[in-house]
Design a protein with these regions (language model features):
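N-terminal [4Fe-4S]-dependent radical SAM core
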Residues: 1-22, 35-40, 154-161
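Cysteine-centered iron-sulfur cluster-binding motifs in ferredoxin-type domains/subunits
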Residues: 20-33, 70
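Classical nucleotidyltransferase
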Residues: 105-161
Length: 161
């Protein structure tokens, strides 16, 4: 898996300062996509060492966001972050309509689902097909459970429905 570039944003994940890693070789090729440069298999290999380097060189972030990527490998990287960087949140943008079965949601704090459909708009449009989920983790009797809560409306302008 490779990435083209990174950016630090304040808007991709609510209330977070996120290091967003733009993963290439996107399989979805959504019409009207704002990042068609991510369709090709180009860029820098995203190894665990490279991920550590990116995190360490972006002090002050509160979240790492993977913008695309293979579910199996994203899950491995998310698990690594969860174990090594206490308190750092993890998000993933996935163009599929469901969370893949290979994903352990316990490794994530945010997951965005849904391919981009130009006529429905992005997360900031109340008519969007895309959904942003916050993963709520609870530990009871030593067992962690994780559930999803739809927080898509946090992206809408106040009063929109």
């Amino acid at each position: 898996m490779k990435y083209l570039n990174t950016m630090v944003t304040f808007s991709e994940f609510p209330d977070e300062i996120a290091l967003c890693i733009n993963i290439t070789n996107c399989p979805f090729h959504c019409p009207g996509c704002h990042s068609p440069e991510l369709w090709e298999d180009v860029g820098i290999k995203l190894t665990i060492a490279e991920l550590d380097k990116l995190i360490k060189s972006n002090r002050g972030i509160t979240c790492v966001g993977f913008m695309g990527g293979s579910p199996i490998y994203i899950n491995v990287l998310a698990k690594r972050i969860r174990r090594k960087y206490n308190g750092l949140k993890i998000g993933w943008y996935w163009g599929g309509s469901n969370i893949p079965s290979k994903i352990n949601i316990g490794n994530f704090d945010y997951i965005k689902l849904g391919e981009y459909k130009k006529e429905l708009g992005g997360l900031d449009n109340p008519n969007t097909n895309q959904r942003m989920y916050k993963i709520i983790h609870k530990i009871s009797d030593g067992v962690m459970t994780s559930t999803t809560v739809d927080i898509t409306s946090k992206f809408w302008k106040h009063g929109e429905k």
